[in-house]
């Protein structure tokens, strides 16, 4: 058994809406190249993804939607019909070959799932995945097919496993949550910026599931301008208590890197420090409850130069137990600086004065603590009753 595998293909770059679109898969290449530069890969660590089949996509997505995506990518879907499927919008424009490009990202997460669930590897990372806004019959928020949702259904069908999905993207993991809203064998936890200010506007504490799945959806909507300490306190508390409550067979973590202060689309005030702690706890919980079974995917993250490579590299470094030291390799900076519109960071950490002090910090911290308490009230009440 390998400790970890890294699912990667240069073809991930084909998932490209247009040059000005904020969703840019060059960030996966930048992360891969940073890890390669610090010699973080052993022989056999890199695994090529496969294409997801239409049958696999249909574990989540409707047949008519899959056909619409194929037609759109071939330039044969009328614009009005495309919009009814969320295709051809400002968020999710049509591009040539979009079905194949999106199927490869899903196939990457399925590849990761098979490596982990078959016992070939303890951990697997597919940073090209994490497209958590995709719905059964509709594209949304840059996401065509929902790789995590397809992988969870695949794992349940093939391996009969209970799945804990932990999402730390700044945007609510709506597509995954609502796919499994009535499923008691899938527990979703999303820690995100409140939907009062940010797409998709969902992810309230009251969204707890339905039917047999009631009580297996957890949401921690954080206030705008939340900083490291408050974010990590919410994450540690919620992830630890939810994992203990659900006792999963495998953990899938979605690792959006858009809670950072630099991110142009969100309003949180985290630094790179949280992206060292987030995978560390996921790793610990996987060994505590799942025999180590941990699948990590990417997600959001729109400062593709200064934030995403360092944040996502930390996932692989945690899996492999590698300490990268303090400095980013100068040769990586030299290689990419000419393409980068801002100065690339020279350190794995952020400076202490990254941004000016947040005036509402005590109020924000207290509000977030109350949110966590409300979200976990049912778990804690059950624990009190069974003592």
Curated annotation (Swiss-Prot):
It comes from the Bacteria. Pathway: Ketone degradation; acetoin degradation. InterPro entries: AcuC, HDAC_PDAC, His_deacetylse, His_deacetylse_dom, His_deacetylse_dom_sf, Ureohydrolase_dom_sf. Keywords: Acetoin catabolism, Sporulation. GO terms for biological process: acetoin catabolic process; epigenetic regulation of gene expression; sporulation resulting in formation of a cellular spore. GO terms for molecular function: histone deacetylase activity. Pfam families: Hist_deacetyl. Belongs to the histone deacetylase family. Role in growth and sporulation on acetoin or butanediol. Involved in the breakdown of these compounds used as a carbon source. This is Acetoin utilization protein AcuC. It comes from Bacillus subtilis (strain 168).
